[in-house]
Amino acid sequence: MMKENKYDEQTFFSKYSQMTRSQKGLQGAGEWQTLEKMLPDFEKKQVLDLGCGYGWHCKYAVDHGAAAVLGTDISQRMLEEAKKRHSDPKITYQCVAMEEVILPPATIDVILSSLAFHYVAAFETLIKSISVWLKPGGVLVFSVEHPVYTAEGSQDWQYDRQGEIQHFPVDHYYYEGKRETRFLGETVTKYHRTLTTYLMTLLQNGFILEKVIEPQPPAELLEIPGMKDEMRRPMMLLVAARKS
């Protein structure tokens, strides 16, 4: 099955490059303050970043002592940008879908993934591979769009006739699978799965859950127009798990 790669489409990539997180990096990501506190010690570690995008997390790991980092992404455009912004002798970038990554068993200390797993159809297959790649005691830290956010599919508020927000729709929650949604004005394929599926898949494949967080906007951002509405429903789910 051909995997969707919207980020190599020029129009979509141009729109993505204008996003705050694309321009400001980790500090421009609303969840970063929370996610950073979930990260393990990187000193002398072998690190894998699945869906590395511009390479922000790759560079962070190296800056915090990682011995080597492999950043993978399906998008050649993303990796070209990563090499421009975050080239480092300790970072290797590879253009490959995360489901097709091939690594020797028990060779990775830390695996990171930021807002990428919801593009993967076969989540359990990926987690099985991650469990194989990680050394005993190795750590997986990832963020995904929250199941409440992905369930109904439109990923948009319901508005009244005056254009005021009424509520956020949650529907078809237990019907997992493909969702066609709008992102940056384009139709994008994502995959919805329940909170139970995310967490139990980890537990059933040799992981111990260490942290599960639904991040809220930092207090200092709540005065930004529209930001208070982000307190009405979770958008992201952050998980840290350790291979037993």
PLM segments and residue spans:
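A short SAM/SAH-binding and catalytic strip from SAM-dependent methyltransferases
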Residues: 109-124
